[in-house]
């Protein structure tokens, strides 16, 4: 295992204005490995943005220890902390560009005051503008740029100090889907070509699914679930995680549509409405034909979807399975052995687990 570049230990952040105490972050332990793209997801108010501001001590924790690049940040002198912060770049939803400066002026701004010649500053900025695809816009002012172009400038500016970590705080939230995809692909390229560790904050599971290797789910200031993205998508445990996953894969909408169309009380004896989750090699196997031909189970497919998540195929299917109880139990056992997860939807509806 590679070394943890970020190690947050027993972090809590409490705000007290004299009238109300807010526990923004509670009992968080988080390790992020060098070179990872780590997503932190949660709804507004979950504490995710507060947590990532702890990484470079823009927000001091009430309790806990912050270790970045092997340095315990709370023990550093102000000068040493300023130097450590140069290794952590940040991009935000609203870009924070200076309107009075050109694209070039915005990118080189963090280098002003450093012992770098004007020629070298410009050369470095041009290399980064080439990386983000804005070489021809060096002398353009921000008000002439699209939202996606502004975010590319912000990324170049964040990289100009040669950070080892890049924090993306809802950086795609204000962008349209096509531009979001382009920015996420750029972040992947930054991670791949420059080896920069990326911490990505979002409320959209689609963003996590697109580029992250690991994910932590936050609610009420706590991490309620974490793990490799493909694993979390395949077998989410916390109800909030299930909600995020099923929304991003359209499974929730499909279940709602199907259960409104089909009267579950009219399912015949020996029929079940089943949701299947496939991962990895199981997506390439003819499991449906196996069920039909080997076990004598009829499969009526009502919904199917397949995604690629962190290099693995992850598929969903909803179907009505028809067969006697023995055949059905044999089918479930057979699929579990091949890495296929199953859920009986009609039982969940009866128990009120599905809206």
From Swiss-Prot:
Its EC number is 7.4.2.11. Keywords: Amino-acid transport, ATP-binding, Cell membrane, Membrane, Nucleotide-binding, Translocase, Transport. It is found in: Cell membrane. It comes from Lactiplantibacillus plantarum (strain ATCC BAA-793 / NCIMB 8826 / WCFS1). ATP binds at residues 42-49. Pfam families: ABC_tran (PF00005), NIL (PF09383). This is Methionine import ATP-binding protein MetN 1. It catalyses: L-methionine(out) + ATP + H2O = L-methionine(in) + ADP + phosphate + H(+); D-methionine(out) + ATP + H2O = D-methionine(in) + ADP + phosphate + H(+).
């Amino acid at each position: 295992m590679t070394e943890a570049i970020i190690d947050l230990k027993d972090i809590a952040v409490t705000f007290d204005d004299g009238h109300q105490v807010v526990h923004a972050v509670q009992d968080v332990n988080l390790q992020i490995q060098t070179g990872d793209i780590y997503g932190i997801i949660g709804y507004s108010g979950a504490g995710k943005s507060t947590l990532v501001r702890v990484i470079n001590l823009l927000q001091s924790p009430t309790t806990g220890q912050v270790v970045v690049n092997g340095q315990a940040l709370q023990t550093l002198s102000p000068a040493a902390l300023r130097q450590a912060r140069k290794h952590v770049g940040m991009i935000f939803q609203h870009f924070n560009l200076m309107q009075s400066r050109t694209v070039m002026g915005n990118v080189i701004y963090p280098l002003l005051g450093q012992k770098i010649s004007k020629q070298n500053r410009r050369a470095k900025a041009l290399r980064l503008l080439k990386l983000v695809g804005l070489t021809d816009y060096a002398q353009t002012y921000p008000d002439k740029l699209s939202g996606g172009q502004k975010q590319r400038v912000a990324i170049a500016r964040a990289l100009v100090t040669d950070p080892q970590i890049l924090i993306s705080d809802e950086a795609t939230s204000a962008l349209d889907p096509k531009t979001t995809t382009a920015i996420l692909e750029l972040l992947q390229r930054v991670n791949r070509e420059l080896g920069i560790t990326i911490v990505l904050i979002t409320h959209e599971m689609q963003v996590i699914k697109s580029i992250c290797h690991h994910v932590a789910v936050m609610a009420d200031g706590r991490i309620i679930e974490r793990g490799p993205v493909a694993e979390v998508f395949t077998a989410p445990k916390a109800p909030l995680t299930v909600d995020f996953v099923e929304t991003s894969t359209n499974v929730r909408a499909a279940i709602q549509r199907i259960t409104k169309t089909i009267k579950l009380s009219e399912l015949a004896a020996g029929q079940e409405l089943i949701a299947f989750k496939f991962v990895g090699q199981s997506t390439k196997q003819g499991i449906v034909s196996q069920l039909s031909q080997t076990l004598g189970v009829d499969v009526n497919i009502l919904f199917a979807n397949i995604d690629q998540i962190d290099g693995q195929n992850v598929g969903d299917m909803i179907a009505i399975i028809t067969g006697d109880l023995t055949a059905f139990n044999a089918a479930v056992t057979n699929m579990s052995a091949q890495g296929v997860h199953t859920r009986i939807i009609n039982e969940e509806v009866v128990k009120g687990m599905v809206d």
